[in-house]
């Protein structure tokens, strides 16, 4: 009997062990890793979006600056840059012949010419077909006369001009700018006028007057 009992105990089969429960540490690690990836992706998207917006702003600003520069350059190119020189004459007359010398008037003689304030009524009343009566534009600077503006008149032909325009003209040329009549008591004919190549019109003076009227 003891032999059978001992042999029977040899064939006893033990039941399998239950599986061990999952560890909580691995689950928390995976959760933290997924959250980190989400934050990294969100930050990368924000950086990319900020870069695109900043690049677009810089491109738009540069394009606007180029457009403004082109427009300003076009305005300057379309406008006429007028010289600031009133009259230019050759000062070295040693190489000129005696007949080609520009004849001008002294300031004392110029000051003796009559001067008056311009008035539209006076201009209309003097418009009788003689001399400069009725003229409303200076033939030197091509600007219209303003009310009460000081003018100077040539004594013989009665043509009148802006005082400063005529004074500058007569310092280089003793004849009237319109009719070339000369008040100089010389036995010769009307003095030679200044060559056009040596005279620059009062364009800047005219431009300044136009700006002042605006």
Curated annotation (Swiss-Prot):
<dbReference type="GO" id="GO:0008270">
    <property type="term" value="F:zinc ion binding"/>
</dbReference>
<keyword id="KW-1133">Transmembrane helix</keyword>
<keyword id="KW-0808">Transferase</keyword>
<keyword id="KW-0833">Ubl conjugation pathway</keyword>
<feature type="zinc finger region" description="RING-type; atypical">
    <location>
        <begin position="138"/>
        <end position="180"/>
    </location>
</feature>
<keyword id="KW-0472">Membrane</keyword>
<keyword id="KW-0479">Metal-binding</keyword>
<keyword id="KW-0812">Transmembrane</keyword>
<keyword id="KW-0862">Zinc</keyword>
<comment type="similarity">
    <text>Belongs to the RING-type zinc finger family. ATL subfamily.</text>
</comment>
<comment type="pathway">
    <text>Protein modification; protein ubiquitination.</text>
</comment>
<dbReference type="InterPro" id="IPR001841">
    <property type="entry name" value="Znf_RING"/>
</dbReference>
<dbReference type="GO" id="GO:0016020">
    <property type="term" value="C:membrane"/>
</dbReference>
<dbReference type="InterPro" id="IPR044289">
    <property type="entry name" value="ATL67-70"/>
</dbReference>
<dbReference type="Pfam" id="PF13639">
    <property type="entry name" value="zf-RING_2"/>
</dbReference>
<dbReference type="GO" id="GO:0016567">
    <property type="term" value="P:protein ubiquitination"/>
</dbReference>
<protein>
    <recommendedName>
        <fullName>RING-H2 finger protein ATL67</fullName>
        <ecNumber>2.3.2.27</ecNumber>
    </recommendedName>
</protein>
<keyword id="KW-0863">Zinc-finger</keyword>
<dbReference type="GO" id="GO:0016740">
    <property type="term" value="F:transferase activity"/>
</dbReference>
<dbReference type="InterPro" id="IPR013083">
    <property type="entry name" value="Znf_RING/FYVE/PHD"/>
</dbReference>
<feature type="transmembrane region" description="Helical">
    <location>
        <begin position="33"/>
        <end position="53"/>
    </location>
</feature>
